[in-house]
Amino acid sequence: GDVVANPESVELK
């Protein structure tokens, strides 16, 4: 992921 706006990154925020 790259930013919180992506579903892949939403758990990594």
Curated annotation (Swiss-Prot):
Determine the domain of life of the protein's source.
Answer: Eukaryota
Name it: Unknown protein 6
User: Which species does this protein come from?
Assistant: Ginkgo biloba (Ginkgo)
